[in-house]
Regions:
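Cleavable N-terminal export/targeting peptides
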Residues: 1-28
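Transmembrane beta-barrel domains of Gram-negative outer membranes and organellar outer membranes
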Residues: 20-266
Length: 266
């Protein structure tokens, strides 16, 4: 059912008249990295971005948790020159948790939640110069226990970027109505991502980022801190392969996250 909805979404978006290939903006995928770009895709264009595989390790004094994701998909469709709609869904997640004291292992394999979002660019939708956007989003609790959040959530992201030749600076403040850790109710979370990107050539780019998120969960307030390094390679004007790694900077954060993926514009 969800796959059918994704293809229907793509077909409707593709029905909007598209620009000639030579008139299209430079490719501007959401992947990779911790932050969110301010750019939007051309009206009528469709972009599919897929995290092929990802792994996160979180170790505490009591347990070790390995989380795997496969097919972390994001479908983007340009509605106007400065507005796009997004549909995100993690096709499969697997969580393995081992109790350090007893050695007991719990495994869960589920589909993930669905995310719906709009991105309205307010300045330079192609991402050039100074670019800023507003991005409200909502998550729907389709995912199973241990992989999905268990309830609906929502939030606002405000991506900001500064392009300085081969260098770019990015900031992604956000405020969220996040789902409680027990899956019942919501609380406030907020934070930001800051990063610098560099174009190593016409085809290869890299970015270094830092993310801080304050989570006011009733079960215990935490501050997640991550540092990330990512790279992308564009073999053509409409596609990109990427790889990235994030490292936790404190006890409230996963120890390490690794991922790779692909983006294709149609």
């Amino acid at each position: 059912m969800m796959l059918r909805s994704i293809w229907l979404f793509a077909a409707v978006a593709a029905a909007v008249p598209t620009l000639a290939a030579e008139e299209r903006r430079d490719l501007c995928p959401d992947r990779p990295g911790l932050g969110t770009p301010a750019c939007t895709i051309d009206a009528g264009a469709v972009m599919l971005e897929v995290g092929m595989a990802g792994w996160a390790l979180d170790r505490t004094a009591d347990s070790r948790t390995d989380a795997f994701t496969f097919g972390d998909a994001l479908l983007r469709a340009g509605l106007t020159p400065s507005l796009e709609v997004q549909l995100g869904w993690t096709m499969l997640g697997h969580v393995r948790e081992r109790d350090r004291a007893t050695g007991d292992v719990t495994r869960r394999t589920r589909i993930g939640d669905v995310t719906l979002a709009l991105r309205q660019n307010l300045s330079n939708p192609d991402g050039s110069g100074f670019s800023v956007a507003l991005m409200p989003y909502a998550t729907l609790p389709l995912g199973g226990e241990g992989v999905g959040a268990g309830d609906w959530g929502a939030g606002m992201i405000v991506p900001v970027s500064f392009e300085l030749g081969a260098l770019s600076l990015g900031f992604t403040p956000h405020v969220d109505s996040a789902v409680d850790s027990d899956g019942r109710g919501r609380h406030t979370a907020y934070g930001s991502v800051a990063g610098v990107g560099v174009g190593l050539s016409d085809d290869v780019s890299m970015a270094a980022e830092v993310s801080l998120t304050r989570d006011r969960d009733p079960g215990g307030h935490t501050t997640e801190a991550l540092a990330g390094l990512s790279a992308g390679w564009q073999p053509g004007p409409d596609s990109q392969w990427d790889v990235g790694a994030n490292v936790g900077l404190n006890r409230d954060s996963p120890d390490i996250e690794l991922y790779f993926g692909f983006a294709r514009r149609f």
